[in-house]
Amino acid sequence: MDHAIYTAMGAASQTLNQQAVTASNLANASTPGFRAQLNALRAVPVEGLSLPTRTLVTASTPGADMTPGKMDYTSRPLDVALQQDGWLAVQSADGSEGYTRNGSIQVEPTGQLTIQGHPVIGEAGPIAVPEGAEITIAADGTISALNPGDPANTVAPVGRLKLVKATGSEVQRGDDGIFRLSAESQATRGPILQADPTLRVMSGVLEGSNVNAVAAMSDMIASARRFEMQMKVISSVDDNAGRANQLLSMS
């Protein structure tokens, strides 16, 4: 089989992977605090016993775009926005600690505070609030609850959000969408981040996604055209091979 088919096939496969990343970004254009996943294509020379005349392509995801999203005023007491390098600690499905910029906190029927289904971690573990209580969040992350029918002066703290600080280069996104410390960062900062008492949150405000929907749509169209071009290359090479076989059979 002509080597050009392998080259075009590899390019088409990686273009599909790149399009999947773009589609994921586009799907999260309205997710609070979402950080767009970066993607790129790079050339990979084919090495072997023969001359290095071929170059394949592979897709790579160098990380996330840490550009802050726009702040949206919601007036919802359980919505919080963080400073640029601040993160909220949450518990992932395997019980490990992860971090998110999504400040849309929800209250489960059990009173558990969650973000996108992940329990919110406080300085003493996962946070739960009394059923039906009115919840407020202070600038330092302290969560207070007022039980139904109680006077306003009986507001009591029930926990404090674990606010941590990390730069974009220190964390990486997992398959569940939650960020964790990279292996290099764990070597210097430990397996989990410690709470930073200097961080502050803004209650009633949400940071929006930093995905540019128009640019993402343009990338989707460009990826589709690249894929179509690679398919035409494969078809052309196959046609040429068929015609060559016909000529050989005639001789």
Residue ranges and their predicted role:
Residues 1-251:
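Amphipathic alpha-helical polymerization modules
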